[in-house]
Amino acid sequence: MNNKSSDSKNTLYCSFCGKSQHEVRKLIAGPTVFICDECVELCMDIIREEHKTHLVKSRDGVPTPKEICKVLDDYVIGQFYAKKVLSVAVHNHYKRLAHSQKNNDVEIAKSNILLVGPTGSGKTLLAQTLARILDVPFTMADATTLTEAGYVGEDVENIILKLLQAADYNVERAQRGIVYIDEIDKISRKSDNPSITRDVSGEGVQQALLKIMEGTVASVPPQGGRKHPQQEFLQVDTTNMLFICGGAFAGLDKIISARGKGSGIGFGADVQSPDERRTGAILRDVEPEDLLKFGLIPEFIGRLPVVATLEDLDEAALIEILTKPKNALVKQYARLFQMEGVKLTFTDDALKQVALRAIARRTGARGLRAIMESILLSTMFDLPGLENVDEVVINKDVAESKTSPVYVYGKEKPAEQSA
């Protein structure tokens, strides 16, 4: 008993989380306090997050494009061209706002952006990351929910209302904000030929978006919708708002290919089958006429002068997405297994196989979670009922669904046993 009490007296504890020296890997001693490695790591994460939210400013007090791009790099893998376009656009937006109060002969117009890229290439993630790091009001809207005024659905003014809410109803701040409209390709005109039926969720929405994207004084109901007819409307000027629109534009690559260089004939012709060029490579050749054929009206295309295309994610990029970001999928599943007291290990060959399966599905990064779920489903089903499992190893054969994962047991059971 005396030995136990003396041991407990000699045991050191973290002054922050209270864990003992036996529960952590490292305990660092100060003059009168101790801190464990887990608390140090947590403090570093907090410092990094605060550093990212305070971007380096240029001479005019405007975030530099390189600094914005660097922060985007921490969250989004690849897509350097799209990051470059977004960084410059946001930088110029800040500059316009910084100089808008000065009396200048030249009025700088805003350059709204259209992001075009295959599904799962990172369009929405880029916008979400911008929202995290910017110090101007930012809102995201879904174009699929919008309808023309007078029909069931959301009015375009609701987008301005969301921005107003993001600015805590400060109209001055909201007027200098950034709006991201996702799934913009879903409001394309349903047919090249005018129809006798009204297209309230397609061309009608494009027409309604024109004025707020160009710059107008919108009347916004503070409580939203039409349920409160007696409410007073807020007047919001959209002239200084930056609009970023994004969409997958499924089928646009076929329109571009059809317009393209045509079918070459003769010995010197450069003949390439459509399958040889990936969707992202074809989308790089997009022209306004292609967007017109897709179903966007000319006036709407004119409001989006900057078009940035995103690439298909290759094998190396998908492997980085699996492992590199702070919330990478491998880290997420490793944490789930850690809750069971088990270490989860993926071999390099296994990660490569997961990336190849995602490429074959043509779903980009979005398909990675479904593949990981299918690989780990049986293991996650069996593991809570197993005892003394130290580690689960996922190799190439497991990733190809040829064999079951390898279970590494503790001392009580043989390590070579597998399920």
Curated annotation (Swiss-Prot):
Indicate the segments annotated as coiled coil, or none if absent. Answer: none
What does UniProt give as the signal peptide span? Answer: none
Which SMART domains does the record cross-reference, listed alphabetically? AAA, ClpB_D2-small, zf-C4_ClpX
Q: Which cysteines are joined by disulfide bonds?
A: none
Per its UniProt record, what InterPro entries does this chain match? Answer: AAA+_ATPase, ATP-dep_Clp_protease_ClpX, ATPase_AAA_core, Clp_ATPase_C, Clp_protease_ATP-bd_su_ClpX, ClpX_bact, P-loop_NTPase, Znf_CppX_C4
Query: How is the subunit organization of this protein annotated in UniProt?
Result: Component of the ClpX-ClpP complex. Forms a hexameric ring that, in the presence of ATP, binds to fourteen ClpP subunits assembled into a disk-like structure with a central cavity, resembling the structure of eukaryotic proteasomes.
User: Per its record, how is this protein called by name?
Assistant: ATP-dependent Clp protease ATP-binding subunit ClpX
What is the species listed in this Swiss-Prot or TrEMBL entry? Gluconacetobacter diazotrophicus (strain ATCC 49037 / DSM 5601 / CCUG 37298 / CIP 103539 / LMG 7603 / PAl5)
